[in-house]
């Protein structure tokens, strides 16, 4: 599939007021205009797109959907056909609500909700950060990356990602346990768009990575996080496989944000690396690797997602 990367992410949250403050004042996002049909939800901008993050009222905090961006109409149509030929149930989405030309919805083999769209609304030079900020690196690479936890890691999940979605397998990283990193076909700027980590009887978001335009933006966000005594997962550091500097802190939703800047443009290694350790400097772990967002599947998935997961789930 000719997919650029993650175009938008949607969440359910019971902490709308906390996000309304945290998004602009900590991350530097702009509060966007909510669609007429979804006034109770909170939409955030991080570039000239209509939105990148949407938070919908809910009883708990959890991921609602991942929106993958196809390059254009023909690529979108080919991707939808590929999903259907693979036997994946595809449902029509609400294009007006998402602010796109067209969108469909489907599930991965462990129950997470995905969407595929093309042509999201945008307006040049319209992004105004919520605080002084140099801006986010998104555009042609997508908004960043997401790492999900899954209680089961069936071969069908790898098949879905590499054969159906057409993602490149990047590797397992240096973490302990089973983790796999993937990037979309058209992403030549970052090592991964999505990763799945195996956590027995656990599901949810482990972290989301956001790229900012310069080191100052990383440092100023780091200072704000410390000044507000927000919980942190890892201090400033540099991963072994990426020429980037980043740190991790926890959001109101219980998952971490990794705030990243590039020291130099990333280039594909040409072969799968097997790093001795996660980072070459820094990234001292000062908080849990799995935050409050990672919980039992019954607290993370809706009934349809749980039904899909039940095909692989081992009895306790």
What is each stretch, according to the model?
Residues 1-17, 63-68, 121-155, 168, ...:
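N-terminal beta-strand motif that seeds the catalytic metal site of vicinal oxygen chelate
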Residues 33-71, 92:
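Conserved donor-binding loop and adjoining core beta-sheet/short helix segment
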Residues 49-54, 111-115, 188-194, 254-256:
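Short, charged/polar, Gly/Pro-enriched secondary-structure boundary elements
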């Amino acid at each position: 599939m000719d997919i650029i990367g993650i175009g938008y992410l949607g969440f359910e949250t019971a902490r709308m007021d906390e996000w309304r403050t945290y998004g602009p004042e900590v991350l530097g996002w702009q509060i966007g205009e909510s669609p007429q049909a979804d006034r109770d939800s909170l939409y955030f901008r991080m570039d000239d797109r209509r939105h990148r993050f949407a938070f919908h009222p809910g009883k708990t905090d959890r991921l609602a959907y991942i929106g993958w961006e196809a390059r254009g109409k023909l690529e979108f149509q080919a991707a939808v056909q590929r999903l259907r030929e693979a036997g994946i149930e595809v449902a029509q989405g609400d294009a007006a609500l998402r602010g796109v030309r067209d969108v469909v919805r489907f599930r991965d083999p462990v129950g997470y909700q995905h969407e595929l769209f093309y042509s999201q609304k945008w307006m040049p030079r319209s992004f105004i950060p919520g605080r002084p900020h140099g801006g986010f690196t998104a555009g042609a690479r997508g908004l960043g990356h997401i790492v999900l936890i899954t209680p089961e890691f069936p071969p069908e999940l790898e098949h879905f990602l590499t054969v159906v979605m057409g993602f490149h397998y990047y590797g397992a990283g240096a973490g302990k346990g089973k983790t796999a990193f993937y990037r979309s076909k058209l992403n030549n700027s970052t090592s991964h768009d999505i990763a799945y980590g195996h956590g027995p009887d656990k599901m949810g978001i482990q972290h989301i990575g956001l790229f900012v335009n310069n080191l100052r933006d990383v440092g100023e966000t780091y200072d704000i996080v410390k000044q507000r005594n927000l919980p942190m997962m890892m201090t400033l550091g540099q991963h072994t496989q990426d020429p980037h500097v980043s740190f991790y802190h926890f959001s109101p939703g219980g998952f971490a944000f990794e705030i990243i800047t590039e020291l130099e443009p990333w280039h594909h290694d040409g072969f799968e690396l097997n790093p001795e350790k996660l980072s070459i400097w820094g990234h001292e772990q000062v908080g849990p690797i799995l935050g409050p967002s990672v919980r039992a599947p019954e607290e993370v998935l809706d009934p349809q997602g749980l039904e899909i997961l039940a095909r692989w789930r081992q009895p306790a």
